[in-house]
């Protein structure tokens, strides 16, 4: 039974980290412990907590710089072992324990413009180091739908076999490099893996719906030029990511992770109705967008647990009460690759 609303961040995160029965079963049958590299991002803490709740007998290890005050202590309070390390350091990587299951979540997107050198280091150099260091592990890597080109909005979305030829922009191309570096070492060393080409996870504190809702409340126009997007509840995305550890391939291969596509206009109209405001639109829908085909994920995992109408209800309620925000816009409307 899904809640009607979240009274607090704690209640939100408790719901978001509740594992499915399928995940509990998957991790029960998965040999070895799990280490999350780059656990300190938007999704990492809840993924680690979900893993621990699903498999309390396993070691769940989170690795990050832990620059956010209180994050390490919060994770430890939920039974997650924490190791402070810089993943760009060979020496610090060498000191990490040998763990058979790796979830790689490190990367850089927001603020990429103006410091492209750091974007490429985080998204290409670090993956090469990690691939070498953990060649004997399974590696599930968080990637992005941005590795694909824009596709016709009537096409059903890019499948995993689509060419990795994104539109101009250094961020998207650095993400192709991340996959290609992991893929190189997977071919050379036989490392099993999977690239999670994620499209827009939804948390009440950030995400496409959060961005739209904030603009509606502020009376700002909604740009329709990127008129379509795939979105998925972050709890579902984390659940699928952890279950993917049982579906790694050698050599590593892609897997699209998201929910069905939405129309930005329709989502904004639905949120505006719930918020009691009138939407203001600007621009017109382009005939192409970053859309993914999720048939393979649906075959492996079944449909997402949380439907769109529930995400809309939750988002409108959260924003109307001026609850917490991460202050990290998705820039879903960007078509020029600049973030």
Predicted segment positions?
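Amphipathic terminal alpha-helices
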Residues: 2-27, 308-339
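Conserved Rossmann-fold NAD(P)-dependent oxidoreductase catalytic core, especially the SDR/UDP-sugar
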Residues: 33, 101-105, 109, 125-170
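N-terminal Rossmann NAD(P)H-binding glycine-rich loop of SDR-like oxidoreductase domains
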Residues: 35-52
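NAD(P)H-binding glycine-rich loop region in Rossmannoid oxidoreductase-like domains
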Residues: 45, 69, 74-122
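Conserved glycine-rich Rossmann-like NAD(P)H-binding loop of the short-chain dehydrogenase/reductase
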Residues: 57-70
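Short alpha-helix in the Rossmann-fold core of NAD(P)-dependent oxidoreductases
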Residues: 115, 119-127, 140, 174-175
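NAD(P)-dependent short-chain dehydrogenase/reductase
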Residues: 168, 176-230, 234-236, 271
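Mid/C-terminal beta-alpha module of Rossmann-like enzyme folds, strongest
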Residues: 220, 227, 240-296, 323, ...
């Amino acid at each position: 039974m899904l809640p009607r609303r979240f009274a607090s961040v704690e209640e939100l995160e408790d719901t978001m980290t509740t594992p499915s029965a399928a995940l509990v079963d998957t991790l029960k049958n998965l040999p070895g412990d799990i280490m999350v590299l780059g656990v300190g991002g938007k999704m990492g803490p809840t993924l680690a907590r979900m893993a621990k709740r699903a498999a309390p007998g396993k070691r769940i290890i989170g690795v990050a710089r832990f620059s956010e005050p209180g994050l390490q202590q919060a994770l430890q309070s939920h039974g997650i072992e924490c190791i402070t390390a810089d993943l760009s350091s060979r020496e610090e990587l060498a000191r990490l324990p040998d763990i058979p299951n790796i979830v790689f979540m490190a990367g850089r997107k927001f603020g990429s413009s103006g410091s492209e050198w750091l974007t490429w280091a985080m998204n290409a150099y670090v993956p090469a180091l990690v691939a070498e260091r953990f060649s004997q592990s399974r590696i599930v890597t968080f990637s992005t739908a941005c590795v694909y080109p824009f596709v016709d909005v009537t096409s059903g979305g890019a499948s995993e076999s689509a060419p990795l030829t994104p539109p101009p922009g250094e961020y998207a191309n650095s993400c192709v490099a991340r996959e290609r570096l992991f893929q190189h070492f997977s071919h050379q060393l036989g490392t099993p893996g999977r690239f999670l080409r994620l499209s827009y996870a939804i948390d009440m504190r950030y995400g496409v719906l959060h961005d739209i809702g904030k603009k509606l409340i502020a009376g700002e126009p909604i740009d329709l030029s990127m008129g379509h997007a795939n979105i998925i509840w972050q709890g579902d995305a984390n659940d699928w990511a952890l279950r993917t550890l049982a579906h790694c391939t050698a050599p590593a291969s892609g897997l699209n992770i998201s929910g069905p596509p939405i129309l930005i206009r329709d989502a904004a109209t639905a949120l505006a109705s719930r918020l009691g405001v009138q939407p203001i639109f600007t621009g017109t829908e382009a005939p192409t967008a970053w859309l993914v085909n999720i048939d393979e994920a649906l075959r492996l995992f079944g449909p997402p647990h949380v439907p769109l109408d529930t995400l809309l209800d939750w988002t409108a309620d959260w924003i109307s009460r001026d609850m917490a925000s991460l202050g990290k816009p998705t820039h879903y409307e960007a078509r020029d690759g600049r973030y």
